[in-house]
């Protein structure tokens, strides 16, 4: 019995660690595409941009993290001054929570896809952020 209680306690500890680096946060979602702004061909670090990549503030969302939207997952590989200073959230947010939201700039392969997605989804949404620690623990 004592061993069972110890095993259950140990499992609970592992489960808590598994979810320790998963968080949900309110984000202002913007879009960019090839040829628009700095998204010509590569991210700031030389990574070739593809669909399912996004730009984030690395101080708030580490590079390599997965940002989970209601319809897709993106990997944080890029950054930019408007993302870091949260210009889109500060100018469009009506409530304090919206003005303080992180900005996630989602990359699309074409302008048409980006604008279609932006028109059919809200400007602010709750996204889940999975850091690499969560991914490694899950494998």
Placement of each model-derived feature along the sequence:
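Bacterial N-terminal signal peptides
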Residues: 7-15
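Positively charged n-region of N-terminal signal peptides that target proteins for export
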Residues: 1-7
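Solvent-exposed, well-ordered loop and adjacent helix/strand elements within mature globular domains
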Residues: 19-139
């Amino acid at each position: 019995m004592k061993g069972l209680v110890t095993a259950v306690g140990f499992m609970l500890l592992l489960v808590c660690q598994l979810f320790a680096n998963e968080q949900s946060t309110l984000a202002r979602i913007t879009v960019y595409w090839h040829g628009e702004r700095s998204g010509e061909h590569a991210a700031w670090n030389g990574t070739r941009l593809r669909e399912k990549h996004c730009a984030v503030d690395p101080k708030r969302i580490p590079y390599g993290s997965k940002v989970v939207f209601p319809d897709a997952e993106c990997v944080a590989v890029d950054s930019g001054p408007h993302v870091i200073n949260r210009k889109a959230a500060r100018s469009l947010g009506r409530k304090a929570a919206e003005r303080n939201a992180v900005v996630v700039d989602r990359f699309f392969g074409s302008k048409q896809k980006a604008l279609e997605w932006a028109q059919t989804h809200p400007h602010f949404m709750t996204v889940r952020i999975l850091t690499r620690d969560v991914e490694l623990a899950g494998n």
